[in-house]
Amino acid sequence: MKKKRILIASIIFILITCIVTAVFIIKNKNRSTSNTVYTYSNVNPDYNYSEDNVLYLDGSGILHLIDTVSGKDIVYCDKPNCTHEGYSRTNQNPSCPAAFYGLSGAVIYNDHLYFIGNMSDEDMTIQYLYVMDSNGENRKKTAKLENVQHVKAVLYRDNYVIGAYSNSVELNDEGQIINDDKPEAGIFVIDLDNYKVYMSDKITSEQANITDIYYENGAVYYSTVRFGDDVTELMIEEGATADAESFAYDNMLNGIYQYDIADEKTTCLTEIDHINNLRLLDGDGYYSSKDGYFVFDTESRQTRQLPIDADGKTQYGPLKKSGDFLYYALSEENSDEVTYYRLKDDKSEELMKLSTEKAFGIENICGQSVYVNYTD
C-alpha cells in the first residue's frame, strides 16, 4: 500500500528549479533563530514549520524538533533519564515536558512554549491556552476557549494567538450529547498582552469548516467551506454514493472572511460556488474551476483569471506562494510525468518534469526552506 509522507528537508530556495527532487539539507550561513515564525500544516495541524526547524507531535503526543541544518529529529525534552512516555489511560499525568494531548501542535514564541488543547480532560467543548517555559516546564493555563471542540490550525503573530476551530455536536449543561449533527466553525483570537479572547461569527450548515487562516495588520482572513443551507446530511450521503466529486463541486460553497480584531467585526468578502481547492495564500484566495484558475484579491474584492493553461491537465498537489511567485504542478492526461511551474507577473516558467513515481507536492515554503510531501 502506498503511503503519503512529508519530507522534512531544507532547500536553498533559489535552487528549487533543479534540486528539489532529492533530499538535501543545506546550511544558510545568515540564518537567525531569534525571530522564528511558524506556519501550521494543512495536512497535519500538529506540525508547525519554520525556516530553521519543524515542531511536531508523534503518535504518542510527544513533541519533536527537526533541525533543518543537521537533519536531526530530537525529542523536545532536556529532563535527565526521562522515558518520554505520553498521555494514556495508565499515565494520565506524564512527567515528560514534551508530552501533550490535543489536536494542535506546540509552538515556540517570544521565548515561551505555547499549546492549545485540553490536557485535563474536563470538557470536550473547552480548550485552553497553555503557556510554559521554553523547555516545556512550568505549564499554566491562561486563556479559556469555550464551545471549541476541534482546533484546526493555529498561528502566532503580532502577540496574538489566532486559531481555527470546528464543532460537530451539541451538549447540554451536564455534558451529554443532545445533537450529534450540529456542524459549525469559526476563528478565535487570544491577545497575549491580557489573554482576552475574541471570537468571530460562526459559519454553519453541513460540513462547515475553516480551511486556511492568515493575519495582517490587525485583521484575520480565513477561507471556509460548507454545503448550502438546503443540502441535508441524507443528500450528502446519497451524493457521495453516486459521484462524490461532482456532488461537492455542484453544492459546496467556498467563502473568504475578514475578522477585524479591534472592532470585533466579521465580514464575508465573497462566497463562491462551482470551484475546486480554494487556498488562502498571503491573504488572497486562489482557486480553480472548469473555466480555469483565478485569484480573489481581498483588498480590492476583485477576481481575475490567471494565465495558467490547464486544458487536458490535472493539478498535482496544492498551489503555493512565496513572495511574488506562485508555484503549481500539472500532469497531462495519459502521461506519467508531472510538470512544475512558477508564475510571476502573469508569466509562467517551467521549472522541471518528474515521473509520477518521483513527483511531490509542496507542503510549505518558509523563507529559504521548502518542505515537500511525497508518496512511496
Predicted regions and their residues:
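Residue position within the beta-strands of beta-propeller blades
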Residues: 56-58, 114-117, 162-165, 221-224, ...
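Repeated scaffold domains used in trafficking and secretory/extracellular systems
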Residues: 38-50, 85-107, 147-158, 205-217, ...
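Short loop/turn segments that connect beta-strands within beta-propeller blades
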Residues: 67-71, 133-137, 191-195, 260-264, ...
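N-terminal Sec-pathway targeting helices
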Residues: 1-15, 24
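Sec-dependent signal peptide cleavage junction
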Residues: 20-36
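A short loop-to-beta-strand structural motif that recurs across blades of beta-propeller domains
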Residues: 62-64, 128-130, 186-188, 255-257, ...
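Short, conserved, GDST-rich strand-edge loop motifs in beta-rich repeat architectures
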Residues: 118-123, 165-182, 225-251
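A short beta-strand motif characteristic of beta-propeller blades
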Residues: 33-40, 74-77, 81-97, 138-144, ...
